[in-house]
Amino acid sequence: MKVAVLGAAGGIGQALALLLKNRLPAGSELSLYDIAPVTPGVAVDLSHIPTDVKVKGFCGEDPSPALVGADVVLISAGVARKPGMDRSDLFNINPGIVKNLVEKCAASCPKALIGIITNPVNTTVAIAAEVLKKAGVYDKRRLFGVTTLDVIRAETFVADAKGLNVDKVRVNVIGGHSGVTILPLLSQIEGASFSAEEVAAMTKRIQNAGTEVVEAKAGGGSATLSMGQAACRFGLSLIKGLQGEANVIECAYVEGDGKHATFFAQPILLGKNGVETVLDYGKLSAFEQEAMEGMLATLKADIQLGVEFVK
């Protein structure tokens, strides 16, 4: 398996690369790209770690050499949030970066599974889809917005609040990947019950967890380490699916049946083609139903921004 990380010199990219070097299947190739000249050095640094994963680093304007033959591409390139910004404030810079990188993916590895980490994910995934359509290589089963960070935060916060073993906690998070579009399905968690006040507070904390990190870092960055872990978990799940492992399920922001919006985060079954099945997210509580209906205008507007960006 060959995995390419685009944006590999950044905070998320380096954390992700370190985790993948340690956790990819033996014999895998890890290809690191960033515009920054430090990137080949990041690869050399990682190459000293004793695992059977070959690492190569590429820098400069053209990511194509890093992409040839890639099975999975994870894109974290872009600028991070600073205090006072929300994910939509990144719209002035990051969409152009994602557009350029996905154009190169379309040319160099059109069959690869592409995971978009770069915010605002609600919009950048729509941009990626339009770019791939223009190139004639779009396959909705092979494009993902990585929302795993919302899932691992939900699992961590719930386990902490309820004194549960975090390894046993599973939380589906549906919708999108910013603010009110993040909807953890707390009503479905086995072995935990919440009062109405707890549901409202926990939902808000999960939705605002990124801001919690941005503020705590006091201008020194955003959630890079936890995002690296989340992206690694999702990337490894993509690979398990490609290798034919059964019952590999993650939540991700994908093009489904369009019932709610063109792109929607929900549980998916992964396989050799990427998304094998978009799974039903189950019955919602009254709170969740209201929250879901309330987010849709925001989500659809975010998606439309991406579509119009590429036109």
Curated annotation (Swiss-Prot):
Its EC number is 1.1.1.37. The active site is at residue 177. SUPFAM superfamilies: LDH C-terminal domain-like, NAD(P)-binding Rossmann-fold domains. Homodimer. It comes from the Bacteria. InterPro entries: L-lactate/malate_DH, Lactate/malate_DH_C, Lactate/malate_DH_N, Lactate_DH/Glyco_Ohase_4_C, Malate_DH_AS, Malate_DH_type1, Malate_DH_type1_bac, NAD(P)-bd_dom_sf. NAD(+) binds at residues 7-13, 34, 94, 117-119, 227. Catalyzes the reversible oxidation of malate to oxaloacetate. The gene is mdh. It catalyses: (S)-malate + NAD(+) = oxaloacetate + NADH + H(+). The keyword Glycoprotein does not apply. GO terms for biological process: malate metabolic process; tricarboxylic acid cycle. One of its GO terms (molecular function) is L-malate dehydrogenase (NAD+) activity. This is Malate dehydrogenase. GO terms for cellular component: cytoplasm.
